[in-house]
């Protein structure tokens, strides 16, 4: 099965294509592109001596609008500015980004558990580096070096470890000196550790408090609290 196309049909198809191209260029208001730069072929039919039909094509350039109209150009500029404004107002850019925090604060606070552990380690290091005082206590068991570090609630057990009986602990007059106390609190989302000295004759309380000397023999300042502000 074969198809034959006459010269008239070919010319009609070419003219129809040219009209479509011109109409598209006028609607878009764009200059002629490289893909549309092909010149339309205008066919002219000539009669040869041999009675045959010859087709000669004369290229003619396509006349595209040299520039867009003022209204079309202003419309394009408004659309472009509108897109830029929308991009600037949007929280998420339409362009791919890596390593950019779109919302939230720039810095992240450490978790309370990590902060608490770090403060505890610092307090332990300070306690180990603080100088200890050697005080001699004379009783029926003889002379001993007292290098105890006071801890809340452990004073009675330390006395037992040195050989004191329960009655001796109750009747013994405390040695005039200071004891170091600590308080751990949670303030404004952070763990804070406070430390201070209290006279040993003052009672030990469950709440943090600064006590005064009751025996009149405890020093006002010791080696531990001399560095306190």
UniProtKB/Swiss-Prot annotation:
Binding site for Zn(2+) 2: 201, 213, 215, 218
GO-annotated biological processes: symbiont-mediated suppression of host cytoplasmic pattern recognition receptor signaling pathway via inhibition of MDA-5 activity; symbiont-mediated suppression of host JAK-STAT cascade via inhibition of STAT1 activity; symbiont-mediated suppression of host type I interferon-mediated signaling pathway
Superkingdom of this protein's organism: Viruses
Region ranges (Disordered): 30-112
List of residues binding Zn(2+) 1: 178, 197, 222, 225
Keyword field: Host-virus interaction, Inhibition of host innate immune response by virus, Inhibition of host interferon signaling pathway by virus, Inhibition of host MDA5 by virus, Inhibition of host RLR pathway by virus, Inhibition of host STAT1 by virus, Interferon antiviral system evasion, Metal-binding, Viral immunoevasion, Zinc
Zinc in keyword set: yes
Biased composition regions of type Polar residues, renumbered to the chain: 30-46, 82-112
Gene Ontology MF term list: metal ion binding
Function recorded in the entry: Blocks host interferon signaling.
Family to which this protein belongs: Belongs to the paramyxoviruses V protein family.
Name of the protein: Non-structural protein V
Species of provenance: Human parainfluenza 4a virus (strain Toshiba)
Taxonomy of the source species: Viruses, Riboviria, Orthornavirae, Negarnaviricota, Haploviricotina
């Amino acid at each position: 099965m074969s198809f034959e196309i006459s010269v008239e049909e070919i010319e009609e198809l070419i003219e129809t294509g040219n009209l479509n191209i011109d109409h598209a260029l006028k609607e878009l208001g764009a200059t002629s592109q490289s893909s549309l730069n092909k010149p339309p072929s205008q066919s002219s039919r000539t009669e040869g001596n041999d009675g045959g039909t010859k087709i000669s094509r004369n290229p003619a350039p396509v006349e595209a609008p040299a520039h867009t109209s003022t209204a079309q150009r202003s419309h394009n500029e408004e659309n472009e500015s509108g897109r830029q404004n929308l991009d600037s107002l949007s929280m998420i850019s339409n362009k791919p980004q890596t390593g950019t925090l779109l919302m939230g604060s720039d810095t992240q606070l450490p978790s309370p558990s990590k902060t608490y552990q770090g403060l505890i380690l610092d307090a332990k290091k300070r306690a180990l580096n603080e100088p200890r005082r050697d005080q001699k206590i004379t009783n029926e068991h003889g002379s001993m070096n007292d290098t105890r570090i006071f801890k809340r609630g452990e004073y009675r057990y330390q006395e037992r470890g040195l050989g004191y009986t329960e009655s001796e602990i109750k009747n013994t007059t405390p040695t005039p000196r200071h004891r170091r106390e600590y308080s751990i609190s949670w303030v404004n989302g952070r763990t804070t550790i406070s430390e201070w000295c209290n006279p040993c004759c003052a009672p030990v309380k469950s709440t943090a408090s600064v006590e005064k000397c009751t025996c009149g023999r405890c020093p006002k300042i010791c080696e531990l609290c001399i560095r306190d502000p």
